Every structure is written in C-alpha cells, then in structure tokens.
Amino acid sequence: MFSLPNCFARSVACLLLVLSPLVCHAEAGVSANRILLGQSAAFSGPAAQLGIDLNAGARLYFDQVNRQGGIHGRKIEIITADDKYEPALTVENTRRLIQNDQVFALFGYVGTPTSNAALPVFTSARVPFFAPFTGALSLREPFNRQIFHIRAGYVEETEHLVDQLARVGIRNIAAFHQNDAYGQAGLDGVQRALRKRNMTLADSATVERNSNNVSQAAQRLLTKRPDAIIQISTYAASAALIKQMRAAGYTGQFHNVSFVGSQPLAQALGPDGQGVGVSQVVPFPWKASNPVVAEYARALKNDGKGEPNFSSLEGYIAAKVFAEGLRRAGADLTREKFIAALETITLKNYDIGFPVEFSPTRHTGSTFVDMTVITKNEKFLN
C-alpha cells in the first residue's frame, strides 16, 4: 500500500546519501566565500607591539588578496585573541579558536612559551600552525607536520651574533635572557655557538617574562664588565637593562635577537640606542631593490598604513606564503591539501626575494639571518 510518509522518508534518506560526501568533506573554517584563520598573540602588555605589528603586516597582504576576489573565490579573515604573552591565556584562546570559532588554521602566534603551551592543543586537533613568531628549537624538533616556520631559528640567529663578535676579537661575552622557554632557547643557542669556538659564557642574568625589573640583572652584569651582552628578551626589558647599565657607565656592546622587536626597542631607547645590534630574519624593510620589500612598501603607501618595520614585514611575508599554499591547494580546500601544497614550495619554483622552501620532511622554511645596528634618531643601518 502506498504511504506518503514512507515515500517522503525514503526521499529524504536518498537525498542525505547524495549530500553526505559534501557534508563529510566540508573543512572547518572553509566556506564558499571565506577562509577563517585564528591568531593568539600579545595585543596588550609589555610585548604588545610585537603582536600588533605582525598582525598589521599580515592584514596588509590579505586585504590586497581580498580586494582582488580572494583565493579560489574565498576571502581570508583573521580572528585575533589577546593572550598578553601569557601561556595560560594562549591555551584558552587556542581551544576557543579551534573548538568554538572553527578556524581553518592558526597563524602568527607570538612567542616561545605561548606557542609551546598551544602545541598539544593544535597538534591533537591536527590544525595547521603557520609562521609563529619564535625561533625556538622546541617547535622545530621533533618534526611536527602541523607547524610551518618562515623565520630562521634562534640557533641560526645566535650563531650569527657570536660569529660577528668573534670575528672582531670579542670573546668576553655575557647573556641577558628572559626566565622562560624563550630565554632558555636563546641562551642554549649562544652557548652552542660559543662551544663551537672553544669559548665560554662570561656570565648570564635573567628577567621575568612581562617584567621590566632588571636591577639585579644590571648589577650582576656590571660586576663582570663583559665586552658584549647578547640579549634574549622583549623590547621593554632589553631597553631597561641597556639604559640602567649605560647610566652606570658600562661601555660594552649590546646585541639582540630579532624577537626583541626592533622598532619598539629603538623607540624605547632613544639616544641610548645608538650602536645596539639586532639580528634580523627578514630582509631590510627599506631595501627597495628587494622584490618583496618593494611590494610591501607599495602596499603600505597605497593603504596609508604607516612606516615600514621588521615585524610587519614578517607578517606580510608570512601572509604571502600562506596565500601561496592556498592557491596551490586548489578550490577543494582541506587542511591536508593545504599542508601538502605548502610542501611543494621550493627555491626553484617560488622566488619572492626572500628564501622560503619546504618539503614533506622539513617545515623550517628559512635560515636567513641578517644584522642591523640602531643609529641616531631611532633609525637602522644594514
């Protein structure tokens, strides 16, 4: 006997069977017209300028892409969450971004302790973790398929710094480092570079994360009077130490790794900044002959987004490489296809003026390190 309800039920069942592949293949954070990214970073507190600048550079590039219709018809959006450079907040933000906001990928996290804290969360969820603003070995070894770096590691940066000092005969070197995973990662790199040259660290002193209380560190280092101090901290604490030691008559050299935040450091130091060194992991932002730098400078000018700086250039490059991965992944976007697409980027098939190369067994995209020195009026010499 014909039954309308039964017929309707069978029709619905058939429809679900037809649609089920589409439902099953829908990826989190991906819709017909949007790709959603999540970024937890310091947007307030002593390290805020790092998150602000990195995000500004990324948005500068993504806005260009979106004005041109996006990638495969999808525009890129970033949800930001302020973690104040605190690991516990980063974990909360990461869980919310993945579980509640359903982001496609995590982008531009700032810091070693914060990224380390998020590591088990995004790894278990198998969410891509792209371009963290850190050079720590803990996020590079052992290999993690979800993580992609576009910056050199602290091993490369500190090797470059120690090499530059050793070449000019400076062997009495001390370290000032943040008392956490970031500081330890940088300190390990310094000691590794010194051992390579049969040198030993003259002394070290610490500062707590998100603190500018450097009085004890300054006193300790002043007693040893090293010829040079390598700093592994953020701009506020590094500037505080330099100012206190200069005021006490210290005339040795100060050198920082790129994470310090170059422009905020120069601004915080004022006249005391002259001669302070900073290693860099992106090209000089005022080098007009470099293709990606020239493109970045034009975008800043066209959008009226202020002056160039190292951190926003890093965000711009990160966004550009991320977008290249999306293009290569194709219109049927999934996280797995995105990861596989990024792994096809090589120096031979992707030349933007900054060396980036991935493979299925190597997700550290660059080992590029350069040196800069702060000059008068908070400018930089390359």
State the predicted function of each range.
Residues L97-V110, F130-P132, A174-H177, R225-T234, ...:
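Periplasmic-binding protein-like
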Residues N302-S312, A323-F380:
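Segments of small-molecule ligand-sensing domains
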Residues N33-I35, G73-I76, N100-A105, S124-P128, ...:
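Loop/turn elements at helix/coil->beta-strand transitions in domains of secreted/extracellular proteins
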Residues I242-G315, T375-L381:
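Extracellular/periplasmic periplasmic-binding protein-like sensory domains
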Residues M1-L36:
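Short, low-complexity disordered leader/linker segments with a strong preference
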Residues V30, R34-L36, Q49-A56, Q64, ...:
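Beta-alpha junction/loop-to-helix N-cap segments that form part of ligand/metal-binding clefts
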Residues L50-R67, L89, F129, E157-H160, ...:
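Short, solvent-exposed amphipathic alpha-helices that sit
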Residues E92, A136-S138, R145-G249, F284-A294, ...:
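Extracellular/periplasmic Venus flytrap/periplasmic-binding protein
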